[in-house]
């Protein structure tokens, strides 16, 4: 779980859920501590403290008005709720697999360099069971998948440890097993989503590794639609 959500507990997350149900995921909504306290079966002071903690954790934004507080759930707050949702799916459905979709795009070539480094390649062979093709398949996620991606935090990744050589240190990375499916229905099952701890990519960009060059194996070009079924 991310550092942000570790700063709040179950009480704050239940409060976050209530304001999200009021519409705070889509924009600012007016919330009064008295009304929130009634719904939480708590005192006004307790409701106020929970909102303050959510704001301090950057899970909500608040503006004070004469009618109460105008509250919006932030992107970090939405990710926290997505993680809660994934946990409940695991509890009641037995798994929390995540399906993402987007379009293939060209990267900047950094993946080829880093994946080929011996400190990473050795761990890929040991922990993933294969030697990846030197390069990543880059996917620009659609808007819905950007929001859904947070559910991956509930999946246990394969950890690739950081390491160092005589020149610099290299950060850790996390890998999740993935099955890829093209718009034509072709599937590829020996792949992993990889997320370096140090990255300039945003949540809308996904990197995938596999033992083969996926563009050739799946006949993919820039702009082609791809579904990614992520598991653990």
UniProtKB/Swiss-Prot annotation:
Catalyzes the CTP-dependent phosphorylation of riboflavin (vitamin B2) to form flavin mononucleotide (FMN). Its EC number is 2.7.1.161. CDP binds at residues 107-112, 212-215. This is Riboflavin kinase. Mg(2+) binds at residues 136, 138. It comes from Natronomonas pharaonis (strain ATCC 35678 / DSM 2160 / CIP 103997 / JCM 8858 / NBRC 14720 / NCIMB 2260 / Gabara) (Halobacterium pharaonis). It comes from the Archaea. Residues 98-232 are annotated as: Riboflavin kinase. One of its GO terms (biological process) is FMN biosynthetic process. One of its GO terms (molecular function) is riboflavin kinase activity. FMN binds at residues 199, 207. The keyword Ribosomal protein does not apply. PANTHER family: RIBOFLAVIN KINASE (PTHR40706:SF1). Keywords: Flavoprotein, FMN, Kinase, Magnesium, Metal-binding, Nucleotide-binding, Transferase. Its cofactor is Mg(2+). Pathway: Cofactor biosynthesis; FMN biosynthesis; FMN from riboflavin (CTP route): step 1/1. Belongs to the archaeal riboflavin kinase family. Transmembrane segments: none annotated. It holds the Pfam family HTH_20.
């Amino acid at each position: 779980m991310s550092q942000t959500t570790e700063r709040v507990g179950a009480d704050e997350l239940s409060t976050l859920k209530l304001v999200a149900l009021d519409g705070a995921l889509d924009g600012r909504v007016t919330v009064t501590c008295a009304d929130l306290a009634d719904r939480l079966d708590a005192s006004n002071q307790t409701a106020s403290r929970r909102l303050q903690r959510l704001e301090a954790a950057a899970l909500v934004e608040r503006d004070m008005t004469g009618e109460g507080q105008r509250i919006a759930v932030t992107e970090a707050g939405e990710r926290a709720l997505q993680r809660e949702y994934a946990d409940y799916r695991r509890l009641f459905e037995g798994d929390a697999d995540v399906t993402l979709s987007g379009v293939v795009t060209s990267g900047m070539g950094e993946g080829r360099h880093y994946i080929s480094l011996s400190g990473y390649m050795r761990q890929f062979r040991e922990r993933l069971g294969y030697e990846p093709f030197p390069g990543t398949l880059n996917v620009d996620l659609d808007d819905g998948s950007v929001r859904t991606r947070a559910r991956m935090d509930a999946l246990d990744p394969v950890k690739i440890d950081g390491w160092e050589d005589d020149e610099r240190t290299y950060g850790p990375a996390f890998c999740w097993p993935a099955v890829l499916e093209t718009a034509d229905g072709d599937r590829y099952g020996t792949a992993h989503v990889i997320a370096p701890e140090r990255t300039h990519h945003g949540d809308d960009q996904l990197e995938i590794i596999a033992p083969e060059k996926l563009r050739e194996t799946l006949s993919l070009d820039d702009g082609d639609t791809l579904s990614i079924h992520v598991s653990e």
